[in-house]
Amino acid sequence: MEELRGYLEKSRSIQQHFLYPLLFQEYIYALAHNHGLNVNGSIFYEPPEISGYDKKFSSLLVKRLITRMYQQNYLINSFNDSNQNGFVGHNKNFYSQMISEGFAVIVEIPFSLRLVSSLEEKKEIPKSQNLRSIHSIFPFFEDKLSHLNCISDILIPYPVHLEILVQIIQCWIQDVPSLHLLRFFFHEFYNWNNLITPKKSNYYGFSKENPRLFLFLYNSYVVECESILVFLRKQSSYLRSTSSGTFLERTHFYEKIEQHLVVLCCNDFKKTLWLFKDPFIHYVRYQGKSILASKGTHLLMKKWKSYFVNFWQCHFHFWSQPSRIHISQFSNFSFYFLGYLSSVPLNPLAVKSQMLESSFLIDTVTKKCETIVPIIPMIGSLSKAKFCNVSGNPISKPVWADLSDSDIIDRFGRICRNLSHYYSGSSKKQSLYRIKYILRLSCARTVARKHKSTVRAFLQRLGSEFLEEFFMEEEKVLSLILPRISYPLHKLYRERIWYLDIIRINDLANHL
């Protein structure tokens, strides 16, 4: 990193952020695959399964590839053959992966330098465990949503044209050759379906081949989509606010990839923004799904919807489906967020009041934010993972049958504990208990299948030791967190507990 910083300091005297020559430096591709970028406390993120430097990635191959990319005969050949490029016998994806990995490291450099300089001013380096937990959003929901009236369930629009992505990057990097290469690279090796595709209805999936570059592009695109919120907050910042807070430091890829949290609470905008007068608004996003809640009327939320649709269409030059923004009242609406099914139901309550010798009942209504485990999507997720069938009946997992008994039980127990940890904030535990039951019985059937025995014989052989693997660890954690609580364990499990060490959504819960 010091070498890269020194190179950039020299380049700034010629042209700001002149990054193109770095594509031909050998150490760039070593950095792209080196574990040194992914040690604890690193500002970069890269999944461990794509780590490891491959000697086939070299700057010489990159130089030859870029030269052929700009040759007209190569372009003709590439359009005639979608699977093979100018290098005979090599797959096109090999070279696209090579360039994208090197380019991903290069485009991160200006952002990392900006982060390092800001950290030097603050004299502190953030650790991954200190990043804000995604579970911290739910206490915010519990505190705020019960006082609001309307909610907009928003799916960030797609697709966006490849040229728009280049223009977004151009706002951050003024290196023209690099931008030209990025534009050519997109149109030569990828179409939009390969770049960012909606694998599920509410979040974006990225290319598995080049996750680093596409995570960077996705975050740049989302920041641009949400720029209207930052603009509106700046317009109202001089006005009196009942509560206000922003967490814009999460917007960049290297600090927290999956979460960008913005909270807006203000009384009144200036007259030029008459459309949004008196919008007591809260906005939260995770991946491609966002929630916009307001204390205003349904008409106000329709105005917000119209404004968002028009802004996205005019700014990104594509049609944004209005159906991707769903507006509803809190009293009759449930929304999926971070694997939970959340709602704010109206609970009727009768209060007995007594004055002197007479007494009477007062009917009142209370609102409380409820978060439960969505059992039907969870069963679908467990079914895809081969723990049960589509009806929720547990089945054995034959791919694990070759493991030892202890390894099988340990794997199932770990999955069960992780789900219990993630869904500890559920207000109703029945769905969580059913998921545990499916995993326990699936584990028993897997071990019984391995020994060609029955589930009953397996349970009789292990007895309580088998259940301890699924329950005792959770009981120990709760006893450490709440040591002074004297409630029975079954009452303790009814309480909602939000763990602030969870920084990403559980894989089995990521079905929404």
Swiss-Prot record:
Pfam families per the UniProt record, alphabetical: Intron_maturas2 (PF01348), MatK_N (PF01824)
Presence of keyword tRNA processing: yes
Record's GO cellular component terms: chloroplast
Location in or out of the cell: Plastid, Chloroplast
Keywords, in A-Z order: Chloroplast, mRNA processing, Plastid, RNA-binding, tRNA processing
GO terms of biological process kind: mRNA processing; RNA splicing; tRNA processing
Segments traversing the membrane: none
GO molecular function, a single term: RNA binding
Protein origin, superkingdom: Eukaryota
InterPro entries documented for this protein: Domain_X, Maturase_MatK, Maturase_MatK_N
UniProt KW Plastid keyword: yes
Task performed by this protein: Usually encoded in the trnK tRNA gene intron. Probably assists in splicing its own and other chloroplast group II introns.
Family: Belongs to the intron maturase 2 family. MatK subfamily.
Name of the protein in its database record: Maturase K
Organism of derivation: Arisaema tortuosum
The encoding gene: matK
